[in-house]
Amino acid sequence: MRTFIYLDESGDLGWNMDEPYQKGGSSRMLTLAAICMPEEKSKYIQRIVRALYAKRKRPLKNELKSVDLNLKDKELFLTLTTKLLSEHKDIQLRSITVHKEYVNARMKKDPNVLYNYMIKCLLLKTICNSQYVDFMPDRRS
């Protein structure tokens, strides 16, 4: 069985906590979120994405950020996603969040160590239980 895993992040891997966030300072949290599903179920995720893009009259090539969604769009996304998850138990949403203030010094020295550790905690079991995995992380900014 082939498993598709899509990964995205919210926050950044910077460590400037002396300045306010987005005014020279880094995010205080880092979240990784993934959706894991059998290959044949990826079409259902694509339908949700297309529905949001169509509602906003936005081309698929332009990434849509949740911060750009209004309340009605967020409600539509949640409604469609909740319905999908209730009908397809083999589709999983997962997330992990770290409060960066409490990250140990070793992980602060090399941001990839923290990022990779979070991926391991989030996805290792799913990856090990799958014969084949297509791992599709979003490009990190």
Label every model-predicted segment.
Residues 1-141:
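Phosphate-ester processing/binding pockets and catalytic centers
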